[in-house]
């Protein structure tokens, strides 16, 4: 019996050449709507779907393939005598190939002016039903939803006269991934339209961007996936201008650096190691900002990741060129800066839009057996809600330093302490199991610079010991959430040493 293929695609990439190849193999082709017109326009002989169903396409194409003659031909088990007898009795013929991709729902809802009606109209019904039927019966039916697989199928047909069973299984698995992702997009769109924040089931879909050489360590396998809709201010959608491909750790560190630099509107540069900032500087221009970020910790910056929120110019590039760095991220690089930096063949240069995340952005964290979902921590300092419990208020310069330290401390692994002075961080204490331990690390790193600096803490002081350490180091201003049952003890110590302290009422834990 002559083999038959059903072709109905929204993405018409390569379909004319593929169908031509099928016809050359003696395969009869059935087609629908716009696909049929395209194939006939290119001189290919195809059969209209209505000739198979005996029923016209109706309701603006909503109903055309939802017919027993189609699904019987797809689902019939060819070595089941009952199925074969029923097909013969009803005049059905088997369909051996299905080439279908779905209505462009993703592209439709990505349009800024899309209406709800447009979105609904672009939910495919017949397509998913066909490819699921074909994939279920993949022992007998080859189903292709991705143009990248056309060449593989044609090559096997030419070589063997049929598609290998292993290939059919792979294609079937791709179908169910394809429909699952498609349904997830629809589910998420409708859920968002209804304003539901915590649905009873969560469906997420990501698209493979690249395989990685390995994960956090060489013995771990890893892959990088991107969100289906472009998040322009992200590493996933950054443009790489130069250098080796990104590693797993590169991606994590670059994401951390980008998150911090988004906090600043003035020219700023952030240096990151192991997802913690080692130096942050701001200035009147990007060169000055980088100089301060470098001076913040000239040891730890070696082998680090740099993020800037302004174009990298030649002067800044020449300074960056002096040390070993893994990645530089910026909105752009001047032509002269690129010439300087591209002389280092392994240095990765990325361009990305610098836009602060919104609270609508969700952070997903996997745990064993589950997934945590929360809003991104995008809350900025609100000066209208702060309180100053100490006798002395911060000076203008202290306020400037406090604000910088507060912007940075929320991005440091808890327990977190950050010291800032003169438009730069001078000490970062991260990830200690007690707060005073983090304070001691930050103070030790700052050394003599701690005198007259400002301290930020991501959470309240359970005891006054951190304030005591700050006083010993000559720190003159502190910003912290407040809210401890022993706040009064910390306030008394601050007043004793003339330290100005600000309560924000907001905690910024980061785990």
UniProtKB/Swiss-Prot annotation:
Protein's name according to its UniProt entry: Bifunctional purine biosynthesis protein PurH
A biological process term (GO) from this entry: 'de novo' IMP biosynthetic process
Keyword RNA-binding found: no
Lineage, uppermost ranks: Bacteria, Bacillati, Bacillota, Bacilli, Bacillales
Keyword line: Hydrolase, Multifunctional enzyme, Purine biosynthesis, Transferase
Gene: purH
CC terms in the record's Gene Ontology section: cytosol
Associated pathway: Purine metabolism; IMP biosynthesis via de novo pathway; 5-formamido-1-(5-phospho-D-ribosyl)imidazole-4-carboxamide from 5-amino-1-(5-phospho-D-ribosyl)imidazole-4-carboxamide (10-formyl THF route): step 1/1; Purine metabolism; IMP biosynthesis via de novo pathway; IMP from 5-formamido-1-(5-phospho-D-ribosyl)imidazole-4-carboxamide: step 1/1
Alphabetical list of Gene3D superfamilies matching this protein: 3.40.140.20, Methylglyoxal synthase-like domain
Domain notes: The IMP cyclohydrolase activity resides in the N-terminal region.
MGS-like domain sequence ranges: 1-145
InterPro entries: AICAR_Tfase_dup_dom_sf, Cytidine_deaminase-like, MGS-like_dom, MGS-like_dom_sf, PurH-like
Keyword Signal listed: no
Family under the similarity heading: Belongs to the PurH family.
UniProt source species: Bacillus thuringiensis subsp. konkukian (strain 97-27)
Chemical reaction(s) catalysed: (6R)-10-formyltetrahydrofolate + 5-amino-1-(5-phospho-beta-D-ribosyl)imidazole-4-carboxamide = 5-formamido-1-(5-phospho-D-ribosyl)imidazole-4-carboxamide + (6S)-5,6,7,8-tetrahydrofolate; IMP + H2O = 5-formamido-1-(5-phospho-D-ribosyl)imidazole-4-carboxamide
UniProt-listed Enzyme Commission number(s): 2.1.2.3, 3.5.4.10
Listed GO MF terms: IMP cyclohydrolase activity; phosphoribosylaminoimidazolecarboxamide formyltransferase activity
Pfam families noted in UniProt: AICARFT_IMPCHas, MGS
């Amino acid at each position: 019996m002559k083999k038959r293929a059903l072709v109905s695609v929204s993405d018409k990439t390569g379909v004319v050449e593929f169908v031509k190849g099928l016809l050359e193999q003696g395969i009869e082709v059935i087609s629908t709507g716009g696909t049929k017109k395209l194939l006939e326009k290119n001189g290919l002989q195809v059969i209209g779907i209505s000739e198979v169903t005996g029923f016209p396409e109706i309701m603006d194409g909503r109903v055309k393939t939802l017919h027993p003659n189609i699904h019987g031909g797809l689902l019939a088990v060819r070595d089941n005598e009952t199925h074969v007898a029923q097909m013969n009795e009803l005049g059905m013929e088997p369909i051996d190939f299905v080439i279908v991709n779905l209505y462009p729902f993703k592209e439709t809802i990505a349009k800024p002016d899309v209406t709800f009606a447009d979105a609904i109209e672009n939910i495919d019904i017949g397509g998913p039903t066909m490819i699921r039927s074909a994939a279920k019966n993949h022992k007998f039916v080859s189903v292709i939803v991705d143009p990248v697989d056309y060449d593989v199928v044609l090559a096997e047909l030419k070589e063997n006269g049929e598609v290998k069973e292993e290939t059919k299984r792979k294609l079937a698995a791709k179908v169910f991934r394809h429909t699952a992702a498609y349904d997830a997009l629809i589910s998420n769109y409708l859920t968002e339209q209804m304003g539901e924040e915590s649905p009873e089931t969560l469906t997420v879909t990501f698209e493979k961007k690249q395989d990685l050489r390995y994960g956090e360590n060489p013995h771990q396998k890893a892959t990088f996936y991107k969100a289906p809709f472009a998040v322009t201010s992200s590493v996933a959608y950054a443009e790489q201008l130069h250098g080796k491909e990104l590693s797993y750790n590169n991606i994590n560190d670059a994401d951390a650096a980008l998150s911090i630099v988004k906090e600043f509107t003035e020219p700023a540069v952030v240096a990151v190691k192991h997802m913690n900032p080692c130096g942050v500087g701001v200035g009147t221009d990007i060169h000055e900002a980088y100089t301060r970020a470098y001076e913040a910790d000239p040891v730890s910056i070696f082998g680090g990741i740099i993020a800037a929120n302004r174009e990298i110019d030649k002067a800044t590039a020449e300074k960056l060129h002096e040390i070993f760095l893994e990645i530089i991220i910026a909105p752009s690089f001047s032509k002269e800066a690129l010439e300087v930096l591209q002389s280092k063949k392994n240095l990765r240069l990325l361009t990305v839009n610098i836009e602060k995340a919104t609270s609508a952005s969700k952070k997903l964290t996997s745990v064993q057996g589950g997934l945590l979902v929360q809003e991104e921590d995008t809350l900025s300092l609100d000066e209208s809600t702060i309180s100053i419990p100490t006798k002395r208020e911060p000076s203008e310069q202290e306020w400037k330093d406090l604000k910088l330290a507060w912007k940075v401390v929320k991005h440091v692994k808890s327990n977190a302490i950050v010291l800032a002075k003169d438009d730069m961080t001078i000490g970062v204490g991260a990830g200690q199991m007690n707060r005073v331990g983090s304070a001691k690390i930050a103070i030790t790193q700052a050394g003599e610079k701690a005198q007259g600096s400002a301290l930020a803490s991501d959470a309240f002081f359970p005891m006054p010991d951190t304030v005591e350490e700050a006083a010993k180091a000559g720190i003159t201003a502190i910003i912290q959430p407040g809210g401890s049952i022993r706040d009064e003890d910390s306030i008394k110590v601050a007043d004793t040493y003339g330290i100005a302290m600000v309560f924000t009422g907001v905690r910024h834990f980061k785990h």
